């Protein structure tokens, strides 16, 4: 008979840590308000549980990327203001209105379309407007900004701008000159436009100081424990721990290989732990023969390739008392930082976190989920 409590892999989500990180942001940027960025299913932790925890802590504003995310979140946060970063493409306008979602408009064309919808519905529609200050992705570039500023009364007719938004390109590096350049550009843009609250800082921007806070900040990965500026001591509490269960322990002789491609060969008699976690679970394949895991706080190198459902560790030097088929190995969390995994995979902590697959159960602690 199968054990219903058995979980081969698990992502433990500490909702109290998410709330603690929210509180830290409040202390750092007050009196500016703090929203919650819960796009990509709350950076992989679970948007529903995270939103409920943040709402219980007093957060009343959330950001998502996709329309579908906003529709789902509305069921969880019926009275919250929910911004949709993707904007308002013509075919999304009816759903945005129906679900009371606030689009972050990214072009004059979107502004015109949203204004037309307001006229058709004979209502004043809320929006945020994104000003591109250097990312060159979404948002009004300089030429469109000038056109909006010169004819704002007409172009914004029937609209209520509740937020001017921009986004920092290099907030993870407090020494980057680009931060000050973008700050100056955003201030210049705001001086050209009708008054409304402004938002500039994401998690990294929160740590840049109150000059970057304006009226609202938008922390994302900081809420989830990311060390966004790679500080010697992470100011944010660890909110997610990824573990996999040891399925088998075996001893191999010197010269024997491990895994596909025989990419690892033992240089000594070696104890191998095979763990129920693989790239189908979101473990980065690139960390094979490069990354580490931890068992009872002791580090063990990943040896051989990461396969679809399994990964292998060299646990030869770990205390035998810590090793059994009941043992859990940590792949990020308390002993292994997200950023260390990202470095081993030559990627960003954001990808490590958001890559965790749906088949990995989320286990919530610290607050009602």
Residue ranges and their predicted role:
Residues 2-12, 17-20, 30-200, 213:
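Active-site-proximal beta-alpha core segment in soluble small-molecule metabolic enzymes
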Residues 2-22, 27-29, 69, 88-90, ...:
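Active-site anion/phosphate-binding pocket segments in diverse small-molecule metabolic enzymes
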């Amino acid at each position: 008979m199968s054990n219903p409590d058995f979980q081969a892999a698990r992502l433990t989500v500490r909702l109290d840590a998410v709330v603690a990180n929210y509180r830290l942001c409040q202390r750092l940027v007050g009196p500016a308000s703090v929203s919650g960025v819960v796009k990509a299913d709350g950076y992989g932790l679970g948007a529903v549980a995270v939103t409920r925890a943040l709402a219980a802590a007093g957060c009343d504003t959330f950001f998502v990327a996709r329309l579908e995310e906003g529709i789902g979140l509305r069921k969880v946060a019926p009275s919250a203001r929910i911004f949709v970063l993707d904007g308002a493409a013509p075919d999304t306008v009816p759903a945005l209105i129906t679900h009371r979602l606030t689009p972050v408009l990214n072009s004059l064309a979107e502004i015109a379309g949203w204004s037309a919808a307001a006229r058709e519905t004979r209502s004043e529609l809320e929006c945020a407007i994104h000003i591109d200050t250097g990312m060159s992705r979404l948002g009004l570039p300089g030429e469109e900004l000038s056109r909006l500023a010169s004819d704002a009364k007409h172009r914004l007719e029937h609209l209520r701008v509740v937020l001017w938004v921009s986004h920092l390109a290099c907030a993870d590096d407090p020494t980057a000159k680009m931060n000050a350049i973008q700050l100056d550009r955003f201030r210049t843009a705001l001086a050209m436009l009708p008054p409304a609250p402004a938002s500039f800082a994401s998690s990294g921007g929160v740590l840049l100081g109150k000059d970057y806070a304006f009226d609202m900040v938008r922390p994302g990965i900081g809420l989830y424990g990311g060390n966004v500026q790679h500080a010697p001591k992470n100011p944010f509490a660890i909110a997610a721990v990824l573990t996999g269960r040891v399925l088998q322990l075996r001893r191999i002789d010197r010269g024997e290989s491990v895994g596909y491609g025989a990419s690892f060969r033992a240089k000594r008699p070696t104890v191998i732990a095979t763990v129920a976690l693989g790239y189908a679970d979101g473990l980065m394949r690139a960390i094979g023969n490069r990354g580490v895991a931890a068992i009872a706080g002791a580090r063990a190198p990943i040896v051989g390739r990461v396969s679809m459902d399994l990964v292998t560790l060299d646990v030869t030097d770990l205390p035998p008392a810590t090793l059994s088929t009941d043992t859990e190995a940590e792949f990020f969390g308390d002993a292994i930082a997200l950023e260390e995994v990202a470095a081993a995979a030559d990627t960003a902590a954001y990808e490590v976190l958001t890559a965790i697959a749906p088949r990995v159960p989320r286990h919530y602690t610290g607050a009602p989920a």
